[in-house]
């Protein structure tokens, strides 16, 4: 479960999000929709622990992001156009990202790719992937 309590984010003097409160139950898929500049990406970054709030808190499974844990290990975001290093294979991209999270098991990376129907042994560079393949790689991430 993810709980948002009085979440506010201010950049310089501009308030992007103000006093957001919500609860997201575990096991469900949620989406965020809104106009350009509404703060959707900022909210998602806050929910994953990729950014810290100016005020308020995000609680994931009873643990406060930024206090009890630095990031939400079981949460992720898939953006419309995922960004990967185009000159590396899908496996190499995931390996680079996994090293940031101290995941060194090649088997875990290969399993994540297989779950989204991508071949971990393929040497095909991500720059040659279709948008759908890049989005599936984003899910594996």
Describe the function of each predicted region.
Residues 139:
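Hydrophobic anchor residue at the start of the ABC signature
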Residues 33-35:
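The feature captures the beta-strand-to-loop junction immediately N-terminal to the Walker
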Residues 95, 106-121:
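Conserved ABC ATPase "signature" region
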Residues 48:
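Helix-to-loop junction immediately C-terminal to a conserved catalytic motif
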Residues 14-15, 69:
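Short coil-to-beta microelement around the adenine-binding A-loop and adjacent beta1/P-loop entry
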Residues 56-71:
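Conserved ABC transporter NBD signature motif
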Residues 2, 17-19:
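Conserved structural motif at the start of ABC-family nucleotide-binding domains
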